[in-house]
């Protein structure tokens, strides 16, 4: 049986105060893609969505999320497929024009929702998370607590975020979030 880094934490998350909900989403398939954006047409066709080229943004395809990490680097995630299927499909689309690496085991995903979740994040993140600045479609590689994360804004109201944290830091970050939410 596969066990994610936050296996057994659902009861702790369920005990959070009203206004903050955290759900661990383990085993999301993730691949890092490096390609010149000018050569990304076949990849975009495969994904069903153009790669975001505006820094610190993400886009949603039918079954994948594509996160801008750099001028020629994206993180492609999908909870709907296996890491092997995601990587092989991306490799076929990229061909010799770029590189694809499976990084699924590197990170785990946390979904954070609620009217106070932005306040919780703000206690440990130096970014301005107000929806006018960090609204739906925004993404950033940043620090939350002392953990490096990829942070996605999933709505325009500041009440739904996704946090991708290195698996080895997942328990630290979960403990930090529980503490920050109880303040």
Predicted regions and their residues:
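Basic, glycine/lysine-rich polyanion-binding surfaces/domains
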Residues: 1-183
């Amino acid at each position: 049986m596969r066990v994610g880094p936050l296996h057994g934490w659902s009861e702790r998350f369920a005990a959070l105060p009203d206004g903050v909900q955290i759900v661990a989403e383990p085993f999301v398939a993730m691949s890092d893609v490096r390609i010149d954006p000018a050569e990304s047409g076949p990849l975009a066709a495969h994904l069903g969505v153009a790669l975001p080229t505006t820094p610190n943004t993400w886009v949603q395809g039918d079954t994948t999320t594509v996160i801008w990490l750099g001028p020629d680097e994206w993180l492609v995630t999908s909870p709907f497929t296996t890491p092997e299927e995601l990587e092989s499909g991306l490799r076929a689309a990229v061909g010799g024009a770029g590189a694809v690496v499976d990084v699924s085991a590197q990170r785990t995903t946390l979904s954070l929702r609620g009217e106070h979740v932005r306040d919780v994040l703000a206690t440990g993140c130096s970014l301005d998370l107000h929806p006018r600045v960090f609204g739906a479609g925004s993404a950033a590689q940043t620090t939350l607590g002392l953990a490096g994360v990829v942070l996605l804004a999933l709505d325009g109201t500041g009440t739904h975020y996704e946090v991708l944290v290195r698996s080895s830091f997942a328990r630290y970050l979960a403990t930090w979030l529980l503490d920050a939410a109880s303040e």
